[in-house]
């Protein structure tokens, strides 16, 4: 919701609760905590209670991804070296050009996979099938990809590196971990 619409929307909700005895359920994947936000002030006088008791504990238990931002840019060669050091890793880059620049750092005989829209759908499916089998078998899998893997692709790597980009894309990449 655009920030400028929050106050008027909450005013309408408060009016519905106070004047018409309406019950309002706020539900979102990223709901802010009421204790730490202006929502508490905006909804003054309304009874606010969590439907799920101990929700913070649920988040802690389900926390499975660690985000790290590198303090300095990494060269393509340094990135390739990091990929080589890992048993199973996926690197997601923003452009096909960037993916190819990283791939250029590898010798032809090195075991590296590539996915992007430079490949036709049939070839991408074939590569994905091979990757799935190798991940399941615990074999080495090093994948350099574009954003093509961020939606509609079921991959589960122990480690994912993502080029800086919009937050929703970074979160999407974390879903591949």
Give the ranges of each region predicted by the language model.
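Interdomain hinge/linker at the junction between the two RecA-like core domains of SF2 helicases
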Residues: 15, 19, 30-85
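Conserved strand-helix element at the start of the C-terminal RecA-like helicase core
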Residues: 82-107
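Loop/turn-to-beta-strand initiation segments
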Residues: 19-25, 88, 139-142
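Short glycine-/polar-rich loops that comprise or flank the Walker A/P-loop
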Residues: 20-22, 61-65, 109-111, 155-159
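Generic beta-strand/beta-sheet core signal
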Residues: 1, 25-27, 92-94, 115, ...
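Short, conserved "post-DEAD/DEAH" coupling segment immediately C-terminal to helicase motif II
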Residues: 2-22
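Conserved RecA-like helicase motor core of SF1/SF2 enzymes
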Residues: 112-125, 130-132, 140-177
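Conserved nucleotide-binding/hydrolysis micro-motifs of P-loop NTPases
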Residues: 24, 30-34, 71-75, 96-99, ...
């Amino acid at each position: 919701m655009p920030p400028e619409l929050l106050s008027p929307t909450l005013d309408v909700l408060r009016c519905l609760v106070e004047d018409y005895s309406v019950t309002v359920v706020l539900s979102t994947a990223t709901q802010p905590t009421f204790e730490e936000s202006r929502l508490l002030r905006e909804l003054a006088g309304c009874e606010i209670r969590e439907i799920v008791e101990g929700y913070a504990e649920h988040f802690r238990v389900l926390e499975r991804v660690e985000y790290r931002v590198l303090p300095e840019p990494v060269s393509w060669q340094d990135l390739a070296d990091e990929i080589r050091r890992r048993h199973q890793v996926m690197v997601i880059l923003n452009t096909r050009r960037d993916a190819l620049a990283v791939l250029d750092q590898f010798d032809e005989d090195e075991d590296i996979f590539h996915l992007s829209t430079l490949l036709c759908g049939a070839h991408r499916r074939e590569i994905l099938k091979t990757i799935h089998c190798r991940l399941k078998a615990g074999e080495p899998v090093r994948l350099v990809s574009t954003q093509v893997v961020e939606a509609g692709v079921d991959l589960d790597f122990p480690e994912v590196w993502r080029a800086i980009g919009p937050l929703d894309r970074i979160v999407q990449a974390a879903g591949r971990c």
